[in-house]
């Protein structure tokens, strides 16, 4: 009896311990999020979409980085090594953006397939994904002309030997198709810093003008010009801001009547240093130009 008295509680304790261990080990990763969670509500889906913006908008305001390999700015004069020696056949010149393209394709596919999102949410998110994808490929098209167009989320067993678009015209046709879908699906108004239908129209007008510049087909060129005009005429609700300086600080940037799409930085987590203006304007005075026999002279001497 004494043996049973001690064995039975021990067995029960062991069973409870094993059961506890089983639940203890049955955990989920805490540093990652499942697709079901991300696309299970509009708020979590928005969080994924908004995290995609910085990688894309940065390509549109870091223009001086590309200019360092051209003769366009003073920046090249300060980095001849980078401009000449480091820019070789191994430099991708903006071609390798496939991780960001994958995020755009995830937005399009996962939002469309979600059973938790409303039809309106799906429509807006898919359109936003296409807008972002068009922005990436337009950036690449300006650099490379022909691109590897990936319009789905690639899996490990997919064929990765993907071809370039057959022509520059085809590249721009695909970009414009995405922009047309974005215009049709995006709301007319969105919170500051997020693309709306007007932002898509504005980008479409620029894409049309760029595409027209690179086509050799006169009929296509005329059609693209006409599409650019239609896109611009359809933009409503914006006007030149009387407070120009306010657009570039917290005084007026969020409520400006001129800004269609911008990337915003908070003073709470942003440190300022060199400005883009310093890298694109020569830090020279007229006295130096005269000494070197150069001209024309600056209307405003010593900008900095």
Please name every model-derived segment:
Residues 1-10:
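Bacterial N-terminal signal peptides that target proteins for export
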Residues 34, 41-58, 75-144, 160-173, ...:
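Conserved, well-structured interaction surfaces
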Residues 139, 143-146, 152, 185, ...:
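Alpha-solenoid helical repeat scaffolds
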Residues 18-20:
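C-terminal motif of bacterial Sec signal peptides marking the signal peptidase cleavage site
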Residues 146-169, 214-226:
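Short coil/linker segments at helix-helix boundaries
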Residues 12-16:
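Hydrophobic helical h-region of N-terminal Sec-dependent signal peptides
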Residues 148-153, 185-193, 240-247:
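Glycine- and aromatic-rich loop/turn segments at beta-sheet edges
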Residues 22-77, 172, 176, 180-181, ...:
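An aromatic- and glycine-enriched ligand-binding surface/loop that stacks and positions planar moieties
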């Amino acid at each position: 009896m004494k043996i049973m008295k001690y064995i039975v509680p021990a067995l029960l304790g062991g069973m409870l311990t094993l059961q506890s261990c089983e639940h203890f080990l049955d955990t989920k990763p805490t540093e990652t999020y499942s697709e079901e969670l991300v696309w299970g509500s509009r708020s979590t889906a928005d969080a994924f979409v908004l995290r995609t913006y910085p990688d894309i908008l940065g390509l549109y305001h870091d223009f001086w980085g590309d200019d360092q390999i051209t003769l366009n700015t003073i920046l090249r004069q300060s980095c001849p090594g980078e401009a000449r020696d480091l820019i070789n056949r191994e430099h991708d010149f903006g071609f390798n953006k496939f991780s960001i393209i994958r995020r755009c394709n995830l937005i399009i596919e996962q939002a469309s397939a979600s059973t938790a999102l409303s039809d309106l949410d799906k429509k807006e998110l898919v359109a936003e994904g296409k807008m972002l994808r068009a922005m990436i490929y337009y950036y690449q098209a300006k650099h490379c002309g022909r691109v590897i167009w990936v319009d789905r989320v690639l899996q490990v067993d997919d064929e990765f030997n993907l071809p370039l678009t057959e022509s520059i015209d085809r590249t721009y046709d695909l970009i414009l198709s995405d922009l047309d879908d974005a215009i049709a699906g995006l709301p007319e108004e969105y919170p500051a810093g997020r693309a709306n239908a007007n932002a898509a129209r504005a980008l479409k007008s620029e894409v049309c003008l760029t595409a027209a510049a690179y086509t050799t087909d006169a009929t296509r060129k005329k059609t693209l010009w006409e599409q650019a005009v239609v896109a611009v005429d359809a933009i409503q609700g914006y006007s030149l801001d009387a407070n120009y300086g306010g657009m570039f600080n917290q005084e007026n940037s969020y409520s400006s009547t001129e800004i269609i799409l911008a990337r915003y930085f908070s003073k709470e987590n942003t440190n300022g240093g060199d400005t883009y203006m310093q890298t694109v304007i020569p830090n020279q005075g007229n006295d130096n130009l005269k000494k070197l026999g150069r001209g024309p002279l600056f209307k405003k001497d010593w900008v900095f």
